[in-house]
Amino acid sequence: MFFRGRPKEGKEPGHETRDSPETVLLDEATGLCKTWYFEHRVHEEVQRCARYGRAFAVIFWEPRLLPGEALTDEAIARIGVVINEGLRQTDLAAQLERTRFAALLVESEHNTARTVAYRMKGSLASRVRGGPGTWRTGLALFPDDGVDVPTLFQVATRKLSEDVGIAV
């Protein structure tokens, strides 16, 4: 039997960092959930809502960028703040790609999800300085638009590409 005693001040080989739940689940740059956790929670929500006959929504937001234009790290951090402030504590958000952001709205019907999607679109357009002025939005509802994660993401992506970027 080995006695470990107090942890060493230095780092042990193979244990360079001890990950807290926040660093494992949240992206440092945005403060939003990491993509793997977001997708995991959407899968769980599909199972839960199928079992209990509930609805939820997945929303994608994406800035309209000119060719060669990119979001700065500062703009991405501000986007994370704006999205976190605009969601309920029960909802989750993530940065899926460099320019694509998503939210999982738990227990949300169509009208609620649509209101959140467009309110957030307006907040992003007005509060992310240095970023693009218009944002595209894609909304998919469970079970109306699909009953599995790939289908819901495809529907949200399709609606995102159909959004003509009309100002909010």
Where are these regions (language model features)?
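Hydrophobic, well-ordered secondary-structure segments
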Residues: 62, 105-110, 124, 128
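The C-terminal output helix
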Residues: 162-167
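Short, internal active-site loops enriched in acidic
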Residues: 62-67, 142-146
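Conserved long alpha-helical elements within nucleotide-processing catalytic cores of c-di-GMP signaling
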Residues: 27-46, 50-58, 64-84, 94-98, ...
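Signal-transducing coiled-coil linker helices
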Residues: 1-46
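A structure-centric signal for secondary-structure junctions around beta-strands
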Residues: 53-55, 90, 134
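Short catalytic/binding micro-motifs of nucleotide second-messenger systems
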Residues: 48, 85-92, 121-131
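A short glycine-enriched loop-to-beta-strand structural element that forms part of the catalytic core
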Residues: 95-106, 130-159
